[in-house]
Amino acid sequence: MSDIKKRILVVDDEPDIGLTLKIILERYGFTVDSFADPETALKNFKPGLYDLIILDIKMPEISGFELYGKFKSKDANFKALFLTALRELDDYDNLKKNVFPKMGERHFIQKPVSEKDLLEQVYSILN
């Protein structure tokens, strides 16, 4: 990665998870904005500002996939990492086969997220 600070947006309806991700990522030099409310995140979204958006897939008001689509309609130049609490292998297979190829994104990570796994994914996506 270059010396320019990468900016990340985190959207997770569980405030503790959003805060934890923010703390971890900031510790490694990223600039992070975190929102627990998807609509607030959308209202505060500025095209061209974020290198990566980390989205919870399952949120009460709007799914991470729907929110991703709304962000993409405003700015096509960011990358995305989806968070999921899905535990069943069949659910993962469905995501990989049916959802991600249509969206052009295949990056996802299972909750609870370890610091190591999070950083590996983020560095891999941004490099």
Where do the language-model regions lie?
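Acidic, metal-coordinating helix/loop segments flanking the phosphotransfer/catalytic sites
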Residues: 34-52
